[in-house]
């Protein structure tokens, strides 16, 4: 969520002093992964990789120690993930843990639209002031106080909105691990919610695009556990249910966007004259003729759904690879994929059920049928559901090649159903979605072995955001955690069987300044959850090139026991300071 709030720093003054002129104290903790040590002599070591969803963003690496008898985690040392070789990070949001024990995340927002950045397009920026608060994204590069021409000479939005990966090799030293940080340009550029690579073969990675006109993407790496090269696909859906009724049911096919490597895409960002590539280097923009929903384009141009409407576009010769990676969403729509997903959020996988689950936070606007002027055109109007401000979670079965084949709603929120004044005993406008159901689902995680889907909210339609447990067999919905007013529950993730303990990761982001820690967020978990009768899996012995094997999967089948409570790993001051390089 985009806030950039100026929260109280009272709780931090003792640690960082009262002069905050060169420091931003973040309350934007988001996804936190727990990674297993590669050091056989130190199985109690666990690594936490922490997202901070700021402009600019930061990823910190915490060395944790796990208590063998209780499973409790404590911080021993703090490191950072250095993305300076990839121009730093902006607004790192949700994430996942790869099957090869690395951290995967992405950059979601915080940079201007590339159409506005291109001086050859209508409505292009003419002054640095046009960037608004996105100027904050340039502080770590020292460009935030320059004029527009100077910024354009040194920076482009195409540097951001990529998948990132953090790998930790502590096999030689726990105190000085090798932390490798990289962006994967091969996987395409979007408003990335998160990448998710399923832990089975053939290996497939899914990427969700949190936009008003988003796409769902699938990446197949050339080599397992190596995301530096592969083939990208975009989802095309055919609606099989009645238009404008319910959450919709769809058949799925996959449209190829071609093959690319990280190195190839990086090279394409810069033209032969040393300047950065622009939108009109890849696409020619044509004129629309006729109505808004059923307009026509000149010969050679295609009506293409883009953010804020639809355009007539023509791909320039030889620009397939550049467009497929730098303008993935628009190129996907151009070649016939579906680009009407509205706030396509978290995604997760059930190994036993062989299904993916993903959240659509707000099932409305571009997902509604024939919504003229808001991203629809008759040629690309693939999705037409009933408006639902409270959002839905969808289920998507996989075939033998681990590709999604169909989509149907699993659970949808209900707008203004239960919440009448006589039942709630209050008339809060912040409970406009049924309080006994989900509202604007954001992060999802599957508890393999327990057959439970975890659903975290990012909503203004519940007074307090919640984390829910959806029981797949009974369809029962249980609220397992709520956060204080003004806060979002972020980074919901099930860290499974680390030395016989499991953790439901859950951060508290941007709470009301009157709440705990003077408005600071927290990094923590529900648990520890004891996994009885299971082989402890705490050491990653294979490194980046080996998938975790069968012991951990078997351990997930054990029943949950023991006391579960919310534990703060570390006060936010340790995990939430960004020293601005200005």
Where does each model-flagged region fall?
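Cleavable C-terminal sorting propeptides in eukaryotic secreted/cell-surface proteins
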Residues: 558-582
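Conserved small-residue
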Residues: 1-547
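C-terminal low-complexity, Ser/Thr- and acidic/Pro-rich disordered "stalk" regions positioned immediately N-terminal
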Residues: 544-558
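Compositionally biased amphipathic helical and low-complexity segments enriched in hydrophobic
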Residues: 116, 550, 581-582
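Generic alpha-helix initiation/capping and coil-helix boundary signal
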Residues: 88, 552, 568-572
């Amino acid at each position: 969520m985009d806030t950039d709030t100026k929260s109280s720093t009272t709780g931090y003054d003792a640690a960082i002093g009262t002069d905050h002129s060169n420091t931003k104290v973040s309350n934007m903790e988001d996804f936190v992964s727990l990674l297993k040590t590669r050091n056989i002599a130190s199985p109690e070591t666990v690594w936490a990789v922490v997202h901070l969803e700021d402009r600019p963003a930061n990823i910190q690496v915490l060395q944790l120690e796990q208590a063998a008898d209780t499973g409790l985690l404590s911080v021993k040392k703090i490191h950072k993930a250095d993305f300076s070789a990839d121009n730093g990070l902006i607004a790192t949001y949700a994430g996942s843990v790869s099957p090869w024990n690395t951290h995967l995340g992405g950059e979601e927002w915080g940079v201007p639209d590339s159409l506005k950045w291109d001086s050859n397009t209508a409505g292009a920026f003419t002054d640095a002031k046009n960037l608004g608060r996105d100027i904050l994204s340039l502080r770590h590069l020292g460009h935030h106080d320059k004029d527009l021409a100077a910024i354009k000479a040194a920076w482009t939005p195409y540097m951001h909105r990529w998948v990132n990966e953090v790998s930790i090799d502590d096999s030689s030293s726990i105190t000085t691990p090798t932390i490798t940080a990289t962006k994967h340009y091969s996987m395409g550029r979007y408003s990335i919610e998160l990448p998710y690579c399923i832990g089975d073969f053939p290996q497939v990675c899914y990427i969700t695009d949190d936009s008003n006109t988003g796409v769902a993407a699938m990446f197949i790496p050339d080599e397992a556990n190596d995301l530096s090269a592969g083939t990208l696909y975009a989802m095309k859906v055919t609606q099989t249910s009645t238009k404008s009724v319910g959450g919709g049911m769809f058949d799925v096919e996959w449209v190829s966007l071609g093959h690319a490597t990280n190195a190839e895409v990086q090279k394409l960002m810069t033209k032969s004259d040393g300047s950065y590539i622009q939108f009109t280097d890849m696409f020619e923009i044509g004129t629309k003729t006729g109505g808004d929903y059923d307009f026509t384009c000149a010969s050679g141009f295609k009506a293409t759904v883009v953010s804020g409407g639809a355009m007539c576009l023509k791909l320039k010769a030889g620009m397939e690879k550049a467009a497929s990676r730098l303008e993935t969403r628009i190129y996907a729509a151009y070649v016939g994929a579906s680009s009407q997903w509205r706030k396509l959020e978290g995604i997760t996988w059930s190994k036993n059920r062989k299904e993916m689950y993903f959240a659509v936070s707000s099932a409305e606007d571009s997902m509604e049928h024939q919504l003229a002027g808001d991203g629809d055109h008759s040629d690309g109007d693939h999705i037409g559901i009933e408006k639902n401000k409270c959002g839905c979670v969808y289920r998507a079965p996989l075939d033998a090649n681990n590709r999604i084949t169909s989509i149907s709603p699993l659970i949808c929120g209900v707008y203004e159903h239960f919440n009448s004044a006589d039942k709630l005993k209050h008339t809060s406008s912040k409970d406009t979605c049924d309080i006994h159901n989900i509202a604007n689902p954001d992060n999802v995680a599957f508890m393999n072995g327990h057959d439970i889907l975890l659903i975290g909210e990012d909503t203004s339609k519940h007074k307090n955001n919640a984390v829910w447990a959806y029981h797949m067999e009974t369809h029962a919905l249980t609220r397992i955690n709520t956060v204080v007013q003004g806060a979002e529950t972020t980074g919901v993730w099930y860290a499974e069987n680390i030395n016989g303990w499991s953790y439901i990761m859950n951060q508290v982001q941007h709470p009301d300044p009157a709440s705990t820690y003077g408005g600071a967020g927290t990094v923590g978990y529900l648990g520890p959850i004891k996994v009885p009768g299971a082989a402890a899996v705490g050491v990653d012995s294979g490194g980046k090139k080996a998938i975790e094997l069968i012991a951990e999967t078997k351990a997930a089948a054990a029943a949950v026991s023991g006391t579960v409570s919310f534990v703060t790993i570390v006060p936010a001051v340790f995990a939430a300071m960004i020293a601005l390089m200005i």
